[in-house]
């Protein structure tokens, strides 16, 4: 009777039994996750959700170590995201107590895993939104680490960090130095370094990877002196610390605007800081709104609460900090139409077959993106980018040019500079770069569409395998390749060698060849390419850079309230001087942050 109650005899169970972690001892106490069986053959994955890596943070203060807990912490469900505005920006969701991480550990049959490479994910979302688990599709979270962990045989960690004003508000001095979200990220990385061995990870083989604001965060973490010895490798997808949106040059301007909205003093930063720290954090979060309608300047200028050069976590302009990353293997790359998401907000006609874009539309976009160099900057940029229009001025060509412009400024050129900087400072470290060009799967987009911003995420996280109904065989091909490159790199520092086979050899980047891997569904020996948009790189780094600056990068340009300002017009024949957006009475902090939904 007893045996029948217990089910099959132990002998039958032996086939299905798998190694699993059970209760794990960490610095805070014991944690227990869930072991999920993956096959009849005994493969499984241990999943821990919601382990605290820091104490509940105090508003606008650095995070502190967690005091620990009694008994065993049941780590079985995702914690809420950090407090942030909803997409409609009229209310908040999430919690102030949000500094938790999640861990996926792949297990074989015989013994629990040990010495596995560790991959820590940093989400994007303009430093304004986002969560460790990402959006939920078909009851599968975007940043679920299972596919990467099991296919690449690596441990995957995701975590929350503070965003928006609570993560990045700064007075630009010691009263509110800012970068709280970056300190949160650092705390998570340091916690993993100290504790991951108990989960079967190799604390000396940690790879950071992230996209958009997360890619820029990865970059900034490798450049900060505080992470010396913590990070072995890093991958930045569509975002580096040199992107114009990744550093706020005039944080006090935006801090004052928040202070005014919530009724705090603005003339004394010490009093302002004291007042802001005791203000309802929900009110602080809602005091900033990203304008979603039509705006005087490109959206780039309104992304305000982002990292700052604080002289501490980021001791200098990031371009000068690459010696700190000399021993970190690095991959950085972009999507071929990363700028499309932003042009779609700045010039909605771009996505409509029925609407044309004019030379004036393009010139206005150029002017808004070249404010620091004034009229000469706008005219020089307009001339370089419209040169191909002499042969072909079709709507498709014009719209693609607009996408190229924002892709270049916001993503590609900064990434190319970052890769060159890394390479020229690297000692033993490897450098690789890529261009992701698998066309967007959004049916509403134009037929000329390439890979939009954030299109790479679904492939890196294995969605074509996790939710196969929504995908085709070719999508699984792309996903398999990306997971193979990413996890091989995490294991060995070389994307070609490790646990998985790859479809094409990815050569290390050299300054001479300016070589990169093009990633899409058709990969073979021709996938390595040379000199991506080199003439545009030269334009931005030499010609444009040499022009006199008319408003400093920190100058705040406030768009006129009544929108009465004359629109800029393109030069007719290089003689007509176009009216320039007035910088004097205007307001947008120069180039800050980006969105990776």
UniProtKB/Swiss-Prot annotation:
The UniProt catalytic activity note for this protein reads: a triacylglycerol + H2O = a diacylglycerol + a fatty acid + H(+); 1,2,3-tri-(9Z-octadecenoyl)-glycerol + H2O = di-(9Z)-octadecenoylglycerol + (9Z)-octadecenoate + H(+); 1,2,3-trioctanoylglycerol + H2O = dioctanoylglycerol + octanoate + H(+); a sterol ester + H2O = a sterol + a fatty acid + H(+)
Gene3D superfamilies, sorted: alpha/beta hydrolase
Record-linked Pfam families: COesterase
Cell compartment(s), UniProt: Secreted
Activity regulation behaviour: Activated by bile salts such as sodium taurocholate.
Glycosylation site residues: 205, 379
Q: Where is the active site?
A: 212, 338, 453
* Disulphide bonds in the chain: 82-98, 264-275
Query: Is Mitochondrion there in the keyword field?
Result: no
Query: Which residue intervals make up region (Disordered)?
Result: 553-591
Biological-process GO terms, alphabetical = ceramide catabolic process; pancreatic juice secretion
| EC number per UniProt | 3.1.1.13, 3.1.1.3, 3.1.1.6
Q: Give the signal peptide as a residue range, or say none if absent.
A: 1-18
Q: What class of enzyme is it?
A: hydrolase
Claim: Iron-sulfur is one of the keywords in the record: no
Which controlled-vocabulary keywords does the entry list? Disulfide bond, Glycoprotein, Hydrolase, Lipid degradation, Lipid metabolism, Secreted, Serine esterase, Signal
Indicate the principal place this protein occupies in or around the cell: secreted
The record's section on CDD domains has: Esterase_lipase
Cited PROSITE patterns: CARBOXYLESTERASE_B_1, CARBOXYLESTERASE_B_2
The UniProt entry's GO CC annotations, sorted and at most eight, read: cytoplasm; extracellular region; membrane
One example GO MF annotation: acetylesterase activity
Q: Tell me which family the UniProt entry assigns to this protein.
A: Belongs to the type-B carboxylesterase/lipase family.
Q: How does it assemble?
A: Interacts with CLC.
Please explain the role this protein plays, according to its UniProt record. Answer: Catalyzes the hydrolysis of a wide range of substrates including cholesteryl esters, phospholipids, lysophospholipids, di- and tri-acylglycerols, and fatty acid esters of hydroxy fatty acids (FAHFA). Preferentially hydrolyzes FAHFAs with the ester bond further away from the carboxylate. Unsaturated FAHFAs are hydrolyzed more quickly than saturated FAHFAs. Has an essential role in the complete digestion of dietary lipids and their intestinal absorption, along with the absorption of fat-soluble vitamins.
PANTHER family recorded for this chain? NEUROLIGIN (PTHR43903)
Task: Quote the protein name from its UniProt record.
Answer: Bile salt-activated lipase
Q: Which taxonomic lineage does the organism of this UniProt entry have? A: Eukaryota, Metazoa, Chordata, Craniata, Vertebrata
Q: Which gene encodes it?
A: CEL
């Amino acid at each position: 009777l007893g045996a029948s109650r217990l089910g099959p005899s132990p002998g039958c169970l032996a086939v299905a039994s798998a190694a699993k972690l059970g209760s794990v001892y960490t610095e805070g106490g014991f944690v227990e996750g869930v072991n999920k069986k993956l096959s009849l053959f005994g493969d499984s994955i241990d999943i821990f959700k919601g382990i605290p890596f820091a104490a509940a943070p105090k508003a606008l203060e650095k995070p502190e170590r967690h005091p620990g807990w009694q008994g065993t912490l049941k780590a079985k469900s995702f914690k809420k995201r950090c407090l942030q505005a909803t997409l409609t920006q009229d209310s908040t969701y999430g919690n102030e107590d949000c500094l938790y991480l999640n861990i996926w550990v792949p297990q074989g049959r015989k013994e629990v895993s040990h010495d596995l490479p560790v991959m820590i994910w940093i989400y994007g979302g303009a430093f304004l939104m986002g969560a460790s688990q990402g959006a939920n599709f078909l009851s599968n979270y975007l940043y679920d680490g299972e596919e990467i962990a099991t296919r690449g045989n690596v441990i995957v960690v995701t975590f929350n960090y503070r965003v928006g004003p609570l993560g990045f508000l700064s007075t630009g001095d010691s009263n509110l130095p800012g970068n709280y979200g970056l300190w949160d990220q650092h705390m998570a990385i340091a916690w993993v370094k100290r504790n991951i061995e108990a989960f079967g990870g190799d604390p000396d083989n940690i790879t950071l990877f992230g996209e958009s604001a997360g890619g820029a965060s990865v970059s900034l973490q490798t450049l900060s002196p505080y992470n010396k010895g913590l990070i072995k490798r890093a991958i930045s997808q569509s975002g580096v610390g040199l992107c114009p949106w990744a550093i706020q040059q005039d944080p006090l301007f935006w801090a004052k605007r928040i202070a005014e909205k919530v009724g705090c003093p603005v003339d004394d930063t010490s009093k302002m800081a004291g007042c802001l720290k005791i203000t309802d954090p929900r009110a602080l979060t809602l005091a900033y709104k990203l304008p979603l309608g039509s705006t005087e300047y490109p959206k780039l200028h309104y992304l305000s609460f982002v990292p700052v050069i604080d002289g501490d976590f980021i001791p200098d302009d990031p371009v000068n900090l690459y010696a700190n990353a000399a021993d970190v293997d690095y991959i950085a790359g972009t999507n071929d139409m990363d700028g499309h998401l932003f042009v779609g907000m700045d010039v909605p006609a771009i996505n409509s077959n029925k609407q044309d874009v004019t030379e004036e539309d393009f010139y206005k976009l150029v002017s808004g993106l070249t404010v620091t160099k004034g009229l000469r900057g706008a005219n020089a940029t307009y001339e370089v980018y419209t040169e191909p229009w002499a042969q072909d001025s079709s709507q498709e060509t014009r719209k693609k040019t607009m996408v190229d412009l924002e892709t270049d400024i916001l993503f590609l050129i900064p990434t190319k500079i970052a890769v060159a900087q890394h390479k020229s400072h690297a000692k033993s470290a490897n450098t690789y770069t890529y261009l992701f060009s698998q066309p967007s799967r959004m049916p509403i987009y134009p037929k000329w569409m390439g890979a939009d911003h954030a299109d790479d995420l679904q492939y890196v996280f294995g969605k074509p395998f996790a939710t196969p109904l929504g995908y085709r065989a070719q999508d699984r091909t792309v996903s398999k390749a990306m997971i193979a490159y990413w996890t091989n790199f995490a294991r060995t520092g070389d994307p070609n060698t490790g646990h998985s086979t790859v479809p094409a050899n990815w050569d290390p980047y050299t300054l001479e060849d300016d070589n990169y891997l093009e990633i899409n569904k058709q990969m073979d020996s021709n996938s390595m390419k040379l000199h991506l948009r080199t003439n545009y790189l030269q334009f931005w780094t030499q010609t444009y850079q040499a022009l006199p600056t008319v408003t400093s990068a920190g100058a705040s340009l406030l768009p006129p309230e009544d929108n009465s300002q004359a629109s800029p017009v393109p030069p007719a024949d290089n003689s007509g001087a176009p009216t320039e957006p007035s910088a004097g009475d205007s307001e947008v902090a120069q180039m800050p942050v980006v969105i990776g939904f």
